[in-house]
Amino acid sequence: MILPFELDRSQTAPIYRQLYQRFRESIADGRLRPGDRVPAVRALAAELNLARGTVEAAYQLLIGEGYLTARGAAGTVVTPQLAPVCAPTQRAPAPPTTHQATHAGTSPLALQMGLPALDAFPRKLWTRLAGRQLRQAGVEGLVYPDARGYAPLRAAIASYLGISRGINCHPEQIFVCAGYRACLDLISHTLMGPGATCWLEEPGYFMARNALLEAGAQLVPVPVDDQGLDVAQGIARAPEAGFAVVTPTHQSPLGVSLSLPRRLALLDWANRQGSWIIEDDYDSEYRYQGKPLPALKSLDQQGRVLYTGTFSKVLFPGLRLAYLVVPAEQTPAFARQADRLHNHCPHLQQATVAAFLNEGHFARHLNKMRGLYARCLLYTSDAADE
């Protein structure tokens, strides 16, 4: 396929942006119609004498905005459902003002925090793994699952945390729950008495606030600055608080990281007071620059940190699968409450995640998504500079 446009290498605009713009113009004026197949990345790179990464960057941007649709082995096509658009030379009447932006004429853009790129999720692979787990499931897969979680998944999580987050724990210390909210419910039923005082980041994660209020906790807002939770302010406001809920790696919603001096100060306070730190380590797999920081739990020598993580923000939110790591001596108490609450996930989902981890798909998916998000950051930065 010979595309009806050329690139001007004398322009200051990046080549991938030119390529992206030429595709948009060709789609707008009808030279490329909905359903038309576009060249493969390798073929177009050879045709235009470009690096494959340049073509891939343009394609990813067009896919992200809904102009193209990737169909795996079937190739990439102009999105069939794409609404007709006007050529750039024709000025259309201004649309009425609306608070809801649309995504290439189709569905609204999803801009909520913590939502992964769902169009990049390996659905076929996931379906194959789930089907295999279902076929191989014995009686264990058809009855109520272990309230503590599927044993192979707990073992896989323990291995993953040791490698990626510096946390040394045994599978018996891990409890698989139906989302972060379920982790908080398990903690509150096991350790929190009526009216327990709890530090909470301000601003902080609204779901944590709601869950703790429903548990009857008395919340003490503690300000957050560019170093994360202000531990000195927390001590000044409620020195004898029994709990502190923090997002040290990627603060919600400000995105800052808790500095090492603050981490040590928080642990020192918890050790002296016998208080509990609830570490929400969501999104720790990603950083704008550098490698992820080790978890706060990895510095915990006295067993005062209750560590929570989730796969929902890395894989897909509908998974509703989180996990909680508790100190070894607290395992029996948490196990009793887990049996009573039944906040567990279906066996099939847990078994599929275990296979995804154990067979190396999770690590490959993370690497792929890190590259994708880095390109998205680049595109956003370029667009902001224009």
Language-model-detected regions and their locations in the chain:
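A short, hydrophobic C-terminal helix/tail in secreted or cell-surface proteins
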Residues: D382-E386
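Conserved functional loop/turn residues at catalytic and ligand-binding sites
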Residues: R31, G66, G216, D281, ...
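Active-site PLP attachment segment
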Residues: A73, S298-A333, L348
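Conserved core of the PLP fold type I
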Residues: A130, R135, E140-G274, E285-Y286, ...
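Short glycine-rich anion-binding loops that position phosphate/pyrophosphate groups of nucleotides
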Residues: P116, P248-S252, K313
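N-terminal basic, amphipathic alpha-helical segments
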Residues: M1-Q133, L142, L153, E329, ...
